[in-house]
Amino acid sequence: LVFYIKAVEIKSKIVKIKLFCIVLCLCVFMACEKYEPVISDEPVIPPTDQPKEPQEPISTDGIINWNNEFIIVGDNNMANIGSNDWNAVTYGNGRYVTVGDSNSAACSIDGINWTATSGFNDLSGICYGNGKFIAVGTGGNVRYSDDGGGWSTVTIPGKTNLRAVCYENGKFVAVGENGVIAYSTDGSSWTAKKVGSNDWNSVCYGNGKFVAVENDGGVAYSTDGINWTAKKVGSNWWYGVCYGNEKFVVVGTDGDVAYSTDGISWTTTTISDAPTIMAVCCGNGKFVAVGRIWNASGYYIRTIYYSTDGINWTSKTMGRGELYGVCPVQ
């Protein structure tokens, strides 16, 4: 009898377990029945070519607002912060945009507070025109953007490293290594050609002409950005060129400066302390050139030169480091 009672109890427990399992399965089934995947009505948009936010903040210590008259960029020279060198800066569409090494770009509304992004190739030059920013750099890469924040990329034929770009008269003109000069009307479709074999370092527009400068004292001019006439103006390297106050001004190594009213006939002069001048611009009633000078202690000093006529210059130093680009405050 005891055995029989135990058997009945065991059988009863088995039945209860089976019932519990059945109820559990029904609950799971009903829960699954109620789930419906959410399908968005929005179309799937492929990722765009947007700069990536850096994992570590990019230093903008190499960006200087000088007397609220000029934005000057260079190496950041800050230990343990980063190695971002800012190479060029421009203004357009209500903001300043600067580009540099270490895959970086930065944007500012007021020229004081900057937002930096990464995800680019190294960029050497930038300009604004025809409603867009154009930045150029290594590998023949050209970046274009409406707002300086979201960028798209094209590559010029030959993939030659580009160093500078300007816009005027309905055309972008970019210059680079090995004699390459490229032009575009929209910033996205480019034609490249060779003008000589040296590296072109800078380009600007003024008085109806594009003017480009190169290593080994070369200066070239063009009325259309396509057909160029080159000549020698001195023997040192020219790094920067600008137009303002009805005059072209060219700057380079050993303190050399050249100026011209027409971009064809040039007069040369020299700044006495023989700096290396990397860039020049004109705005707010003066020319400003920036670069570096070697210090007896064995390092470079950031140097600014300013002039009202492009001939007579006054210098100012700004501590240890190098300066590479400049544009007027708007």
Question: Where does each model-flagged region fall?
Answer:
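Bacterial signal peptide processing site
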Residues: 33-35
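C-terminal motif of bacterial Sec signal peptides marking the signal peptidase cleavage site
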Residues: 28-31
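N-terminal secretory signal peptides that target proteins for export/translocation
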Residues: 1-15
